[in-house]
Amino acid sequence: MARDEVRRILPADIKREVIVKDDKAETNPKWGFPPDKRPIELHIQYGVINLDKPPGPTSHEVVAWIKRILNLEKAGHGGTLDPKVSGVLPVALERATRVVQALLPAGKEYVALMHLHGDVPEDKIRAVMKEFEGEIIQRPPLRSAVKRRLRTRKVYYIEILEIDGRDVLFRVGVEAGTYIRSLIHHIGLALGVGAHMAELRRTRSGPFKEDETLVTLHDLVDYYHFWKEDGIEEYIRKAIQPMEKAVEHLPKIWIKDSAVAAVAHGANLTVPGIVKLNAGIKKGDLVAIMTLKDELVALGKAMMSTQEMIERSKGIAVDVEKVFMPRDWYPKLW
């Protein structure tokens, strides 16, 4: 069966132009640690794992296992997967734990197996499922951890992969907080026969995909052993991504070395500290503040648009909400 031609684009795939405000600014190589050059201990402390969650355990249990495997105090996951669901589960470690907030606007992708409760012609299945692209209204399932209020969610694309009788295998890209089980239930109602979700796997969570960075719990056990027992850090380094991976999709503002320590101490970012920034930033957007070495300094809410940040010479550009940069990586220069 030929696959439908579908453009599979999530918010995380948006390409952003970079606008330079200060073309004379440089960074001192003595300060900070470029994401790919951190000592292994810091790499782990400021890292994120692209985990292939197995079906069976809860997301919380999987995170607890990772903490035991890697001997960590803190870890957090980005987007809960139900016990029976497998696939991409970003797990942020130690000092990077709060970076999972950045994944909320990035979009998610799943491959689902829908079982119809009656026979339906293929052309009708395709036509009806196409109608579910765009904004839909959902109520969280009874067993959900959130209040069961009606809410709007966006379906970015639906791609039918295979139809075999009453079984429909499809790929779907959705906004965070979209319930695929509920989506399938409503598709079944629209088809007039009813349907239920037979299987589900998450294949993307923003910048985290089913690619060479995806690792299993067994991989982590082996790689940690290689490092601790044999002194081989190559594998654990590949298994853990720098926390900057989790903000790849966000609009960014790069700042001067002289502004880094102030933001690391919790100060809001002011316009004079900006070197370059992405086009299209709107007031209220979640933005990532970066060093000129592409280190994540903080997340915050834009208080100006890109145009205003370029044109103005003073004022608060970003209300800083979460700081990730240690206070001692860059010197106080204020």
UniProtKB/Swiss-Prot annotation:
Domain of life: Archaea
Molecular function GO terms recorded: RNA binding; tRNA pseudouridine(55) synthase activity
Disulfide bond entries: none
Stored InterPro entries: Dyskerin-like, PsdUridine_synth_cat_dom_sf, PsdUridine_synth_N, PUA, PUA-like_sf, PUA_sf, tRNA_PsdUridine_synth_B_fam, TruB_arch
Coiled coil residues, start to end: none
Pfam family, one: DKCLD
UniProt KW keywords: Isomerase, tRNA processing
Reactions mediated catalytically: uridine(55) in tRNA = pseudouridine(55) in tRNA
Domain PUA: 250-325
Enzyme Commission number: 5.4.99.25
Example of a GO biological process term: box H/ACA sno(s)RNA 3'-end processing
Active site: 82 (nucleophile)
Statement: the UniProt record of this protein carries the keyword Transferase: no
Family the entry assigns: Belongs to the pseudouridine synthase TruB family. Type 2 subfamily.
Role description: Could be responsible for synthesis of pseudouridine from uracil-55 in the psi GC loop of transfer RNAs.
NCBIfam families, alphabetized: CBF5, PRK04270.1, unchar_dom_2
Protein known as: Probable tRNA pseudouridine synthase B
Organism taxonomic ancestry: Archaea, Methanobacteriati, Methanobacteriota, Thermococci, Thermococcales
